[in-house]
């Protein structure tokens, strides 16, 4: 089976959506994937409609889609991967915690995927609950910020992540903010000036290592001003 391309899906999501509402989308459209590109484009149209639609309608449409997919194991795997790319991937314009949570609820309940295959979806759903815009900021080892703070999350074993320390620090938009670098994984501890450093052992329970380098901005009142954003 052809593997799902996050890059292709993101391009498709940005291209626009078809006319019509989302609630009846999968009653009007097939889940056929014999033409993989057409199926991917069709799902991209659905994802754009879903994130813009009333939540009740979007969730109802998700149920219709999953009910169809339960009769097609190969399609279930394929569409589950597309949902991961559309509703979880940071670069996707359709990243959405509610819709991703709905997808994970169905994936774990429907019994098509094996329990061990559901685990990555469950972990991503948990990661997605942290540091959403307007919610309480959370970094292991920090009770609260005492000033507006730029938090950069990086993989200590990733050269690109280490490069982000210098690139982000040099950006004038962050002048005047406290700067906290949260290092995850294994590797030499960075020493780029201008940053406070934190290396929490439990960091990967909160942050997706594969998503780094990312940053978010926390306010002195303990809330998230700007959610996760690619640092480079």
Each model region followed by its residue ranges:
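Short loop/turn motifs at secondary-structure junctions and domain boundaries
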Residues: 206-210
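Sec-dependent N-terminal signal peptides
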Residues: 4-14
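Short active-site neighborhood of thiol/selenol oxidoreductases, capturing the structured segment around
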Residues: 141-170, 178-183
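Non-catalytic, surface beta->alpha helical segment in thiol-disulfide oxidoreductase systems
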Residues: 211-232
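Thiol-based oxidoreductase modules, predominantly thioredoxin-like and allied folds used
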Residues: 176-202
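Oxidative protein folding and maturation machinery
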Residues: 17-141
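Active-site proximal loops enriched in glycine and acidic residues that flank catalytic Cys/His/Asp
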Residues: 152-157, 181-184, 199-201, 219, ...
